[in-house]
Curated annotation (Swiss-Prot):
Its EC number is 1.4.99.-. FAD binds at residues 3-17. InterPro entries: DadA, FAD-dep_OxRdtase, FAD/NAD-bd_sf. One of its GO terms (molecular function) is D-amino-acid dehydrogenase activity. GO terms for cellular component: cytoplasm; plasma membrane. Pathway: Amino-acid degradation; D-alanine degradation; NH(3) and pyruvate from D-alanine: step 1/1. Pfam families: DAO. Belongs to the DadA oxidoreductase family. It catalyses: a D-alpha-amino acid + A + H2O = a 2-oxocarboxylate + AH2 + NH4(+). Its cofactor is FAD. The keyword Oxidoreductase applies. This is D-amino acid dehydrogenase. It comes from Salmonella choleraesuis (strain SC-B67). It comes from the Bacteria.
Amino acid sequence: MRVVILGSGVVGVTSAWYLSQAGHDVTVIDRESGPAQETSAANAGQISPGYAAPWAAPGVPLKAIKWMFQRHAPLAVRLDGTPFQLKWMWQMLRNCDTRHYMENKGRMVRLAEYSRDCLKTLRAVTGIEYEGCQGGTLQLFRTAQQYENATRDIAVLEDAGVPYQLLEASRLAEVEPALAEVAHKLTGGLRLPNDETGDCQLFTQRLARMAEQAGVTFRFNTPVEKLLYENDQIYGVKCADEIIKADAYVMAFGSYSTAMLKGIVDIPVYPLKGYSLTIPIVEPDGAPVSTILDETYKIAITRFDKRIRVGGMAEIVGFNTDLLQPRRETLEMVVRDLFPRGGHIEQATFWTGLRPMTPDGTPVVGRTRYKNLWLNTGHGTLGWTMACGSGQLLSDILSGRTPAIPYDDLSVARYRSDFTPTRPQRLHSAHN
């Protein structure tokens, strides 16, 4: 089958790889000059299935109000009055109760755990290297309340079968030696030993080369104007004066998916702006071993071979990609506070990207009412974590194979009022 994939980020490229391996003739189209040039370019670098959770959670609306008056707030909102933004925020607000949180987290952890298994298999089959490390993730707590919340929230991990270690502050240096110098600032941490790290852009670029060698065609520098449709099917992709035709079409345009699908399929994917710093390592012993998550500031600090990636924060500001100095100062503050000797911050590269976020946090993967249009978008801050699983899942569904995990509640159909999943999976409530 001829398949056209729109988008060459980590989700689009993994989709291309798995569809090609399933025997399909795949073409990837992107306006950029190469793969992973936008959202996948400089993300936090963590592959953390156990921490997969929606931003829409109990208590977030009240926290958002408090964050409005904080200099280093993890979330910022700038209202623009557009119906798109207001509707999305209202949908997110409706997901901030315990029942929805547990349903959404259950879906996300299921896909994220499966994705890690798919990445492990891909690594074994191809030998792909991307400065990866299987050193786990350590979530740091700065207050007694955060530590207390974690003791209750671990029931969620137990329900999903995710291994964990709850550590007091005195034990943090056992897994992250550089934290010995700052342990007095912390109350403890939650470690997930099975989590991984890696350079998402490097992975995507190398997998794209492997996919090209396997027969995938990449059409870079090719802006897409619109999808052409009639009745219940897509019949082409209009790119300038050219119409590219296929048997099936996959939307993996990230934050731009919603606009491209306007009038065809209504999906609630909104651009959630985030920032990162990439810092050269000065003293390896003063840098993190793997990934650190600062619970207070929602900042991730990840170790690559010779670099530290510091990423996080979320801004609901539409498609604005301005690099704001106060956001850089927040990233610098957190990394200086935890790893003062680790990196040469003055030489850091500052970056921003738009994460394609759904109001319930769960990506949109699967079929649509158009018989040859498929979606793989809306992964939010977890595109790197979920990419391989989403690509394999999409390939299986499109190819008529039975996927390894339940998937109907990942499709766009879940937003219908009459939707009932075939095999609903929910976690026992432990969120506070």
